[in-house]
Amino acid sequence: MNKEPMSMHGYNKICAELKQLKEVERPNIVKEIDIARGHGDLKENAEYHAAKEKQRFIEARIVDLSEIVANAQVIDPSVLAHNKVSFGSTIKILNLDNDKEFSYTIVGSVESDPAKGLISFGSPIAKSLIGKSKGDAVSIQLPNGESDFEILDIYYKEICFDEN
């Protein structure tokens, strides 16, 4: 698997979820399964089957998160030069087709939240912008077709990951 770029915030968030799953959720589901097992015939025991399904989900999530942590590439965007678009850059772009301005910050996939302007490093928009400079024109493939943009500004600002 390729390295997964992320900020320290994203890394800590994944590690906290992994710890919660291993230390709290996993032991709790084992108890739930034991209790359900005590309710008789396992073939017709909906509580048992639901608990086993939940256990499969928890174990799969642990595997996924463990892989992400193992492949994490923690990047401090505050120390990068943002003269070209890179991880952690905030980019102001102008859609040349409709004169609308957009602002995006490039973050790791585990941190992305497009509604808040936080786009994944691996997203089509970010891939089109990475390495470009202020003033560059860029064609970006969007769901409704290709659009042309101009990069108006590239800068670093502290990324707001508010969890609300």
Swiss-Prot record:
Superkingdom, taxonomy of origin: Bacteria
Q: Which family does it belong to?
A: Belongs to the GreA/GreB family.
User: Gene3D superfamilies, per this entry?
Assistant: Transcription elongation factor, GreA/GreB, C-terminal domain, Transcription elongation factor, GreA/GreB, N-terminal domain
The molecular function GO annotations come to:
DNA binding; RNA polymerase binding
Note whether Transcription occurs among the keywords: yes
Q: What is this protein called?
A: Transcription elongation factor GreA
Check the record and name the InterPro entries matching this protein: GreA/GreB_C_sf (IPR036953), TF_GreA/GreB_CS (IPR018151), Tscrpt_elong_fac_GreA (IPR006359), Tscrpt_elong_fac_GreA/B (IPR028624), Tscrpt_elong_fac_GreA/B_C (IPR001437), Tscrpt_elong_fac_GreA/B_fam (IPR023459), Tscrpt_elong_fac_GreA/B_N (IPR022691), Tscrpt_elong_fac_GreA/B_N_sf (IPR036805)
Q: Which organism was this protein described from?
A: Helicobacter pylori (strain G27)
Q: What is known about what this protein does?
A: Necessary for efficient RNA polymerase transcription elongation past template-encoded arresting sites. The arresting sites in DNA have the property of trapping a certain fraction of elongating RNA polymerases that pass through, resulting in locked ternary complexes. Cleavage of the nascent transcript by cleavage factors such as GreA or GreB allows the resumption of elongation from the new 3'terminus. GreA releases sequences of 2 to 3 nucleotides.
